[in-house]
Amino acid sequence: MKYLNLLILCLIVNLSFGQTSNWQKWQPIEKSHSLRIKTTKAEYYSLDLKGLKNQISNAPEAKDRDVIAPILSLPMPGGKMIDFNVISSSALAPGLASKYSEIKSYIIKAINDERVQGRIDVTYQGFHAMIQKGADLVFIDPALDKNTINYIVYKKTDLVRTNNFACLVNDESEKESLNFDSNDIRVSDNNFRTYRIAISCTGEYAQFHGGTKEMVVSAMNTTINRVNFVYEHDFAVRFEIVDKNDTLIYLNPSTDPYDNNDVGTQLDENQNQCDEKIGSANYDIGHIFSTGGGGLAGYAVVCKNNRKAGGGTGSGSPVNDAFDIDYVAHEIGHQMSGSHTQNNNCNRDDSASFEPGSASTIMGYAGICAPDVQQHSDAYFHGHNILEMGNYIVNGTGNSCPSKTILPGTKPVINTTSGNHIIPKLTPFEMEASATSEYPLLYWWDQYDNEVAEVQPPLPSNKLGPLFRSYDAVPSGIRTFPKIEYIVNNSLNTWESLSAVARDINFVVTVREDITDGARHSQAFDKLTVDANKGPFLVNNPNDKNVT
């Protein structure tokens, strides 16, 4: 009750969940000074957790397509409720799931719009949700420590960055060559891959999460459930926390084998601990969580004995999207052969620096290396990471250890005309692609020029490097450069700069199936040339922002 006393109830609203009863209530509550997650804007609710658990207890697995899924209503920013179908999708291996039977994870899909989808989990720490709703990523998390009643609902864009983070990469000499040519990109196939992940932790991480194995396994489950949301979408890959993983959980900072603040020494010790406690043959990738030390990971180490546990993530506040996506998904990305994509000089990888500034996708440095495109990473990978990580997963060492199941149908086929398109200087333009598939498709265009840019944010005079930031996938294969609202309003977008000089601008388009449980993708390249002796092409009349 002491946690409830921190809150002042300001409004009670009865809302029904599901289609047949109103037995579950959410109650908006006033903001508290002791909130676990800091935002600039949010809404607050209380939840009948027991009722919610009962409501979704019979959720079918994805393979049981003939079983009717339960319906769950969840609050969105602005107060709207959305109904979702709920499908069971455990992030724990069967033995671990049986031992910690209160920990459950699910896929959710909106009934009226299957593009609104995400992940939820119910654990000893309460309820968590991560929902992709168009361009918005929405979260529902416990508002207070050790409290499963009160919750915060917020958009990722409203999350306040509370600490700095540094990421290092061990031994990039392990990069495996991309064995394809530009006309035949085979970095996605018809397999859904499951990697067994062993996660250890320092005593400090355990104490942050309540100091019991039940609470720590719960926290690890929430993180991996959210990481799976991204990796299943972009690579048809999921991670399953191994049986006996609780033997890697250390509750006492004084007696654990790790230095909480030195992620470098953690990796060597973590390799020893995972091999000793789990057995090298019983896991495919290992990782350690801490509350300090930043992030460090071996490059392309998944499936490699004596190296595969070489990944770690530390944060003073190891919760919510900043930890799960910005940090953990990023460090695991290195272990899966993902490179830094930011063009800034903070740990830049010259072979992969395709994004302006600090970048905005997972393998960039969003919010931690000025000038920043934005404060947090968007929950997807840049086209180059899709290329190199997909190659490692499908054609490289990363294909040697996961279990595989065959996906129905075939991957998308892109129907696009590539070539050298010529445009006048300082002239907006569109890139267009189309593809065929038996499933709905999503498209995203990324610039594919990795030279070190002369100036960041990019200027029209830049002759090298990226001019255009990445944006998340949309149902249309057309992207306008810059975004159409900037063109209509005669305004500038800091991170989308038209060129005023003669140069080539290269692009990669990624097309992905719009499904939650194992999406495949295809990619193609295109290029345009800027003619500095012509243009700019202008619309002089009418020149009114109200004209469309």
What name fits each language-model region?
Residues T436-D446:
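Solvent-exposed loop segments of extracellular immunoglobulin-like
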Residues I422-A435, T548:
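A short beta-strand segment in extracellular, disulfide-stabilized domains
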Residues Q19-D141, T265-D268:
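N-terminal prosegments of processed precursors
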Residues V511-A519:
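Short, solvent-exposed loop/turn segments at the edges of extracellular beta-sandwich modules
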Residues E240, W444-V501:
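Exoplasmic/lumenal beta-rich domain surfaces
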Residues I393-V413, K527-P536:
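Proline/serine/threonine-rich low-complexity linkers at boundaries of modular beta-sandwich domains
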Residues V242-T265, C303-A379, E451-V455:
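The catalytic-center signature of Zn2+-dependent metalloproteases
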Residues G18-I37, I149-A297:
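Fold-level signature of zinc-dependent metallopeptidase catalytic domains
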